[in-house]
From Swiss-Prot:
Pfam families to which the protein is assigned, alphabetical: UPF0179
Family to which the UniProt record says this protein belongs: Belongs to the UPF0179 family.
Name used for this protein in its record: UPF0179 protein AF_2154
InterPro entries hit by this protein: UPF0179 (IPR005369)
Annotated PANTHER family: UPF0179 PROTEIN MJ1627 (PTHR40699:SF1)
Source organism: Archaeoglobus fulgidus (strain ATCC 49558 / DSM 4304 / JCM 9628 / NBRC 100126 / VC-16)
Length: 153
């Protein structure tokens, strides 16, 4: 991933504005409705995981959600690591992510089958096939580990 091209400038809480910090954007809150700088904060994709890769020089802005205020940072969206059906996991393929119906909650691969960053039916691109699943699927599905990226809308 070319980080220079994919950098997004946004705002985050001053107390956790450090290079290397990763977070999942949960979306705006009611307090954001009338904020004059909300467009800068809310341009991230809800549910996506980001990493802070740069700090911007600038003033601390007041924010009702962050006691210390917010500052400008540069972030990149991180790839999503997930288990994908081996029949459709081809590098460069555009697929609709389908969450498996599974009740084996104690499975060590459950979070790979159900990544919190993705919604059912979301269009993604298989960036890279990483390899075999860490273990056999207890439901008998043929899956492999892949790096996914949301398709541009």
């Amino acid at each position: 991933m070319n980080e220079e091209v994919n950098k997004i400038i946004t705002l985050c809480g001053k107390d956790w504005a450090k290079i290397g910090v990763e977070f999942i954007f949960l979306g705006g809150k009611q307090e954001c409705e009338n904020c004059k700088i909300k467009k800068t904060c809310l341009k991230l994709k809800e549910g996506a995981k980001y990493k802070i890769v740069g700090l911007r020089d600038g003033a601390v802005q007041e924010c009702p959600l962050h006691d210390e205020g917010v500052v400008a940072v540069e972030v990149v969206e991180l790839p999503i690591i997930a288990l994908v059906d081996s029949k459709i996991a081809v590098e460069g393929a555009k697929i609709h992510y389908e969450q498996r119906k599974c009740d084996v909650y104690d499975c060590s691969m459950y979070s790979l089958c159900h990544p919190i960053e993705l919604n059912n039916g979301e269009t993604v691109i298989v960036e890279k096939v990483i390899g075999d699943a860490p273990e056999q699927c207890r439901k008998g599905h043929s899956v492999i580990v892949a790096e996914l990226r949301r398709a541009e809308e």
